[in-house]
């Protein structure tokens, strides 16, 4: 997977979707490459608060909607949009061990899935999603991939880190 994985690292979502549509790559290959990058980079950068790699691999191996982004891996921000069965904390310390579990996908998540996107997990946000930096006490800071001593900003700091480092295209 080396050549494909390297090619995907900074390929945008439309390029990745085109690889699937042309048969040059499968959704499973896209997901595996993204998971490998996340596992390699996230320990130092701290973009994610939760992963759902097994579920993503199962989805990618099965039938996906024939949407414009079929097979493209993505991450949800840990606020507002929800996916069924996932625990949400919204960056809040008091929800770290008492997180709300979503009974269903939010409308936005349903639309993402209908477009063919494959959910790999959720990204860090500041506590209450209101700080200009993503440094939640509950999970530690997200780090700028170009200068780990700096914040990627907020409230989408974890998402910014994931895209800027090539973990996922969206």
What are these regions (language model features)?
Residues 6-9, 65-72:
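Flexible N-terminal pre-Rossmann segment of NAD(P)-dependent oxidoreductases
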Residues 70-170:
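Short glycine/serine-rich loop/turn segments
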Residues 16-20, 60, 159:
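Generic hydrophobic alpha-helical segments
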Residues 1-55:
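An N-terminal boundary/leader segment
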């Amino acid at each position: 997977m080396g050549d494909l994985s390297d090619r995907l690292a900074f390929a945008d979502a439309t390029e990745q979707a085109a690889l699937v549509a042309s048969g040059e790559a499968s959704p499973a290959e896209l997901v595996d490459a993204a998971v490998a990058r996340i596992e390699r980079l996230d320990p130092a950068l701290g973009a994610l608060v939760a992963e759902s790699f097994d579920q993503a691999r199962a989805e990618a191996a099965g039938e996906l909607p024939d949407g414009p982004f079929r097979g493209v891996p993505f991450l949800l921000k840990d606020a507002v949009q929800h996916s069924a069965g996932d625990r949400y904390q919204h960056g809040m310390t008091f929800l770290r061990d008492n997180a709300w579990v979503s009974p269903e996908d939010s409308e936005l998540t349903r639309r993402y899935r209908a477009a063919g996107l494959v959910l790999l997990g959720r990204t860090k946000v500041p506590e209450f999603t209101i700080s200009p930096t993503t440094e939640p006490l509950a999970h530690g800071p997200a780090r700028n991939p170009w200068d780990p001593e700096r914040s990627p900003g907020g409230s989408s700091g974890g998402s910014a880190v994931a895209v800027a480092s090539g973990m996922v295209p969206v």
